[in-house]
C-alpha cells in the first residue's frame, strides 16, 4: 500500500442488469433518428477543434440522450419499441450495407444516445447505487471517485486480464 493511493475495490453488476435495461425499456426510433440526424448534421466532423477535444463526443452523445428523452416524452408512447430491438436494427443496418467511418460513427452515436435517453429500471439503478455505497463505506468516504467499465466476455479472466475492448469512464 502506498500512502495516499487507495487499493482498488471492485464491484460487478451482473450483465443481467444490462439485459434488463435492453428488454424492459423502450425508445421511439423515429425520435432517436430525427434528433441524431438533425444534430449530427450540424457538426463539422473535420474541424480540428472537434477532433482534438477528447470529451466532445461524450458530451455530444449525453446532450443527444437528454434531447431524445424530452422529445420522446412530448411524443408519447404510441410507436415505442424495445431498446434491444432498436439497437439490433441499427447494428444490422451497418452489417448489411457498405458504409464509411462517418456512417459508422453516426450509428454508434445513435445507439449510445438511445441508451442514454431511457429511464434506467429501478432495480438496475439500485444495484449500481448499492455497489457504490459499499465502496464508499469501505473507504469511509461518501464521495469516492470510481472507474466504471464494461467488460466483454474473456476480459479480466485469470489468463487474460486486459482492458480496452469496452469503454472505461474514470472519476465518476
Give the ranges of each region predicted by the language model.
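N-terminal beta-alpha lobe that positions the nucleotide/phosphoryl donor
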Residues: 1-172
